[in-house]
């Protein structure tokens, strides 16, 4: 038992060292080398090569179809000995048999890049899955690459306006930065990503790449239809977005590599065409989860909470490639599922250190009916600085956070003693804070079909002026519900006017009934 344990640990060490070497090594003379399947354990396949095993991360093709409708691609992740490689399958291994013939491709998994990919849907291997024929690409690139050198990286501190009030005001996003949307199941991460695609990608001059990592097939279809409706994807004209899917019904190998496939396409637009690229990843936790499954299948000893011992390295290798260079930039928006709403879970906690802005979605906020369910007191942004954003913006944002913090403190007193026991100053703070909370809600354009409310894109200047007026008491006479699920302050005043007219009409009807009853 001890001998097997020691050999398993050594095999894991070999795979890590080999992975670093393979990512930078040129294609060797092992292309076309033939091997045979020697063992199949679910998604893990051992392949024996009489002439020596190819390097780690080499892609292998199973030549014998054995009644399968689709080809099978493997990726070497460990060297068991000089002639045997342990591989992870990118598709299901159903019908795969021992002694099946396997051929080395001579390099990593590669995907098509360039403008020919725009408007198309791909899987982890770069195969088009939208049933629209061949892509006709002129170039393919390997999905494994090293991060740009420090000298080639560039930092930019410009605000990326989203049109979403709570984001633009309290946690502004940075162009060329990495943004995380943290939240448990069903609090609205995907809806916010779809609204950001709608608001930012439509008005964005460059291209966008969307990576669907381990999420629902239905959501992928909805996103594709939404993009066609908004003309981000135009089947008859010029599209601006590429979709790459490795969904939750696929093996862990596909889910563990699909983010690299999408990132490779984004890197081409950044490095070769000098574009400012938007990269959307939904969900980065599924990337970590897939790598954890792969690690368990390879027999590695798990670390904290059952995650793989290489959690930080796996995530770091991906995140360090998402950066801005002197040629172009990649702005990344990543949804991060929080298991059991525990933000200290190793997967989301490890992701925190890579981000420029963190947007925390709170289930308690969602249950109170405020959407987007952002908790402004838990969020942070690197560019929330008066040297980057305007001084007025900074001051208003800080005052909003301060008032919401005071309101949270007063809620405990209200729960015990009631609001009547507060001082007049505190009562005023509570009244304005409740309006602030309602005003942070906003109907989304992508959710119009579900909510029945018209979506709003709010300009940054309008957002700052509206919240500034609310803090100063300009709208103290406006009823609280007029601030709920609206756009800018003009929408608030229109809703308040409509509410007053409806109240007057109801009062008129009541008086008419009273008069009729008395007569």
Swiss-Prot record:
One of its GO terms (cellular component) is mitochondrial inner membrane. It is a peripheral membrane protein. Keywords: ATP synthesis, ATP-binding, CF(1), Hydrogen ion transport, Ion transport, Membrane, Mitochondrion, Mitochondrion inner membrane, Nucleotide-binding, Transit peptide, Translocase, Transport. InterPro entries: AAA+_ATPase, ATP-synt_VA_C, ATP_synth_F1_bsu, ATPase_alpha/beta_chains, ATPase_F1/V1/A1_a/bsu_N, ATPase_F1/V1/A1_a/bsu_N_sf, ATPase_F1/V1/A1_a/bsu_nucl-bd, ATPase_F1/V1_b/a_C. GO terms for molecular function: ATP binding; ATP hydrolysis activity; proton-transporting ATP synthase activity, rotational mechanism. Residues 1-21 form a transit peptide. It comes from the Eukaryota. Gene3D superfamilies: 2.40.10.170, Bovine Mitochondrial F1-atpase, Atp Synthase Beta Chain, Chain D, domain 3, P-loop containing nucleotide triphosphate hydrolases. ATP binds at residues 184-191, 216. It is found in: Mitochondrion; Mitochondrion inner membrane. Its EC number is 7.1.2.2. Pfam families: ATP-synt_ab, ATP-synt_ab_N, ATP-synt_VA_C. Mitochondrial membrane ATP synthase (F(1)F(o) ATP synthase) produces ATP from ADP in the presence of a proton gradient across the membrane which is generated by electron transport complexes of the respiratory chain. F-type ATPases consist of two structural domains, F(1) - containing the extramembraneous catalytic core, and F(o) - containing the membrane proton channel, linked together by a central stalk and a peripheral stalk. During catalysis, ATP synthesis in the catalytic domain of F(1) is coupled via a rotary mechanism of the central stalk subunits to proton translocation. F-type ATPases have 2 components, F(1) - the catalytic core - and F(o) - the membrane proton channel. F(1) has five subunits: alpha(3), beta(3), gamma(1), delta(1), epsilon(1), plus the additional subunit P18 (Tb427.05.1710) that is not present in F(1)F(o) ATP synthase from metazoa. Subunit P18 (Tb927.5.1710) interacts with the alpha subunit with a 1:1 stoichiometry; the interaction is direct. Subunit gamma is part of the central stalk. F(o) has three main subunits: a, b and c. Belongs to the ATPase alpha/beta chains family. This is ATP synthase subunit beta, mitochondrial. It comes from Trypanosoma brucei brucei. The lineage of its organism: Eukaryota, Discoba, Euglenozoa, Kinetoplastea, Metakinetoplastina.
